[in-house]
């Protein structure tokens, strides 16, 4: 359960619980202090009220004593020889009575407690009677009325006031004792509350300690131990920490780091093995490369000789192509001229055909006129026959006109037939001339294409000539590079030896890590096969690069 709670949430809950306990304890302490304050206020008020009543009672007793002494002296000194002493006693009685009234006024100004209301009212009633009696006694003594003085029942009033004050004192004592008992009870209750809070606090601390230890300390200790094992090179153990809090996330991150480190170490081991085997293959390849470099040098010499012969042949082909291009251009000009002549003939034939068509149209008009004339002559003959002898001459003329119209129509038909035959022949000639023009156009186009092809052949021959010159330069450059390759082979052998030593050191460094049993033996041959496959494909890639270089040349 604790593993599912985040550390921040747990700390906030603990702080919330402690804050709640602090509020509860503070509230209880405030309540206890409030009760104590109320008890203290009650005790203080009782003390002040009791003090004022006591002072009032004492002063009233002194007033009674002074009055009694003054009355006694007045009775013993009938001649009034000690009038000053009597006056002083009487004045003291007035003063003490006034002081008693002042103290009682202070008592009355204090608000009585509810429990003391009845006793306070009783005291007030008895006080008012006794105070009035004392004032009346003072007045009797001032007037010298001794009979009235002794006849007044002052002692009964004094006793009644004393009993009322005693009752008030007993009620006050009971209230004070109740207040004290309540304070003692509050104190014991506060002690019990503090004890309960202490027990609850201890229980909460135990729960918090158990939760922190279970959710934070123990998983953190396992994570630290696991990290130390990883630091010592042991990658075989796994970290088992469950939960969705920060410690669980930390454990998951450490576990992911361990897996990544295992993959890295495995790849480094495989890479070091591949590098070690690759350095051996590089050393063997350097030996083969040295012999192949010598063979390449001799082949380059033969290639240089062949390139010289090829250069001479290509230059001769370029010259022949230039001459053929010039002849083709001349034939193209002649064909263009013939095409223009044929175009002129075609245009002339079209004009003749148009003229023949116009003549045929005119003959058609003449034929129509002859036909209309024949009809008119026929109508004239009919009218002449109707006229009789008067129209005989007109009939002869009409007959001649008909004969002329018939011969004109016949001649027009023959001319029309000849013209139509001429038009058909002109059309046939036009078709033949157009065919000849198209043929001349095809000849011109063919000669033009031949001219273009010969020009391209000539330019290609020039390009080949320049390319062969560049190839010759490249062959000489390749010869120089081949000489450099011989020295590079020696440097490569030294580098392969150094690489083999570094691979051995890398293998020793990686061997410090201990890995769990994994099917690595199966992966290594696959790695070797992939390396061999890549090495087998290398000549093809080199050949492809060589072809690209040849195309560049």
UniProtKB/Swiss-Prot annotation:
UniProt modified residues of type Glutamate methyl ester (Glu): 302, 491, 500
Domain (Methyl-accepting transducer) ranges: 271-500
GO cellular component: plasma membrane
Record keywords, A-Z: Cell inner membrane, Cell membrane, Chemotaxis, Membrane, Methylation, Transducer, Transmembrane, Transmembrane helix
Region listing for Disordered, in residue ranges: 532-553
Bias type Basic and acidic residues, positions: 544-553
Subcellular location: Cell inner membrane
Function, in words: Receptor for the attractant L-aspartate and related amino and dicarboxylic acids. Tar mediates taxis away from the repellents cobalt and nickel. Unlike in E.coli tar, it does not mediate maltose taxis. Chemotactic-signal transducers respond to changes in the concentration of attractants and repellents in the environment, transduce a signal from the outside to the inside of the cell, and facilitate sensory adaptation through the variation of the level of methylation. Attractants increase the level of methylation while repellents decrease the level of methylation, the methyl groups are added by the methyltransferase CheR and removed by the methylesterase CheB.
Full protein name: Methyl-accepting chemotaxis protein II
Source organism: Salmonella typhimurium (strain LT2 / SGSC1412 / ATCC 700720)
Encoding gene per record: tar
């Amino acid at each position: 359960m604790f593993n599912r709670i985040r550390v921040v949430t747990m700390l906030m809950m603990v702080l919330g619980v402690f804050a709640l306990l602090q509020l509860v304890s503070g509230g209880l302490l405030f309540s206890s202090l409030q009760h104590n304050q109320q008890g203290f206020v009650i005790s203080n008020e009782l003390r002040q009220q009791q003090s004022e009543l006591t002072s009032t009672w004492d002063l009233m007793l002194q007033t009674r004593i002074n009055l009694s002494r003054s009355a006694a002296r007045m009775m013993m000194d009938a001649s009034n020889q000690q009038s000053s002493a009597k006056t002083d006693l009487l004045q003291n009685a007035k003063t003490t009575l006034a002081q008693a009234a002042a103290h009682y006024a202070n008592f009355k100004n204090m608000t009585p407690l509810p429990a003391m209301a009845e006793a306070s009212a009783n005291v007030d009633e008895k006080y008012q009677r006794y105070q009035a009696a004392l004032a009346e006694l003072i007045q009797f003594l001032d007037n010298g009325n001794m009979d009235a003085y002794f006849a007044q029942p002052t002692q009964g009033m004094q006793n009644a006031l004393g009993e009322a004050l005693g009752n008030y004192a007993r009620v006050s004592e009971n209230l004070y004792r109740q207040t004290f008992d309540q304070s003692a009870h509050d104190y014991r209750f506060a002690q019990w509350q503090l004890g309960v809070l202490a027990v609850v606090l201890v229980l909460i601390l135990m729960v918090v300690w158990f939760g922190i230890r279970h959710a934070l300390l123990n998983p953190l200790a396992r994570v630290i131990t696991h990290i130390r094992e990883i630091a010592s090179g042991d990658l075989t153990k796994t970290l088992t920490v469950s939960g969705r809090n920060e410690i669980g996330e930390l454990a998951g991150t450490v576990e992911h780091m361990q897996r990544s480190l295992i993959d890295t170490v495995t790849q480094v081991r495989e890479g070091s093995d591949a590098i070690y085997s690759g350095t051996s293959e590089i050393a063997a390849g350097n030996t083969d490369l040295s012999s192949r470099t010598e063979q390449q040098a001799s082949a380059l010499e033969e290639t240089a000789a062949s390139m010289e012969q090829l250069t001479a042949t290509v230059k001769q082909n370029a010259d022949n192509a230039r001459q053929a291009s010039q002849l083709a251009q001349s034939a193209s000009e002649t064909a263009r001229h013939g095409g223009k002549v044929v175009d002129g003939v075609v245009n002339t034939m079209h004009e003749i055909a148009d003229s023949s068509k116009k003549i045929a149209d005119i003959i058609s008009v003449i034929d129509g006129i002859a036909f209309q004339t024949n009809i008119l002559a026929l109508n004239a003959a009919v009218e002449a026959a109707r006229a009789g002898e008067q129209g005989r001459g007109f009939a002869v003329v009409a007959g001649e006109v008909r004969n002329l119209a018939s011969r004109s129509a016949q001649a027009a038909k023959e001319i029309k037939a000849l013209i139509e035959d001429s038009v058909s022949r002109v059309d046939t000639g036009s078709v033949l001339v157009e065919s000849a023009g198209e043929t001349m156009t095809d000849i011109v186009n063919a000669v033009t294409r031949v001219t273009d092809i010969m020009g391209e052949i000539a330019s290609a021959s020039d390009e080949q000539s320049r390319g062969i010159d560049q190839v010759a330069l490249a062959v000489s450059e390749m010869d120089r590079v081949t000489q450099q390759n011989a020295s590079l082979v020696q440097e490569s052998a030294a580098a392969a030896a150094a690489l083999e030593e570094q691979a051995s050191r890398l293998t020793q460094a990686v061997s410090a890590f201990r890995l769990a049993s994994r099917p690595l033996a199966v992966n290594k041959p696959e790695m070797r096969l992939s390396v061999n496959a890549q090495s087998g494909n290398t000549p093809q890639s080199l050949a492809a690069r060589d072809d690209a270089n040849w195309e560049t040349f």
